[in-house]
């Protein structure tokens, strides 16, 4: 995988390809359809194409922030997988980690009819 700063986190397709390259590095090409669907769903979520919900309206917790976190986590997974530490991370561990980072701000989604405030109101502390 390219160094984190070399991945254009303003472009979901660039991050998707970087993550897929990392998965290929551990022989997990079978995860590609899952990753493609996940990135497509999360892109739609942030853009307001998730049925019954608005686009995420947070200034910092935007899609680029999520993509930046995804690139960073992917590098952590790669480093951990090259180490001799145990337990060994399996493909499913990688999948769950990427799902988690991509969805970590989904709690900020507001329902379509909710017109007051931002999604931050759904957190206990923000």
Q: What residues fall within each predicted segment?
A:
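Non-catalytic interface/linker regions that flank or bridge core catalytic/transmembrane domains
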Residues: 1-56
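Divalent metal-dependent catalytic cores for phosphoryl transfer on phosphate-bearing substrates
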Residues: 92-126
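Short helix-loop boundary/capping segments at the starts of domains
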Residues: 44-52, 72-82, 108, 112
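Generic serine detector
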Residues: 12, 31, 81-83, 100, ...
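Hydrophobic transmembrane alpha-helix bundles
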Residues: 1-6, 71-76, 94, 119-126
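Generic structural concept
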Residues: 39, 70, 98-100
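Alpha-helical phosphate/pyrophosphate-handling elements in metalloenzyme active cores
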Residues: 54-96
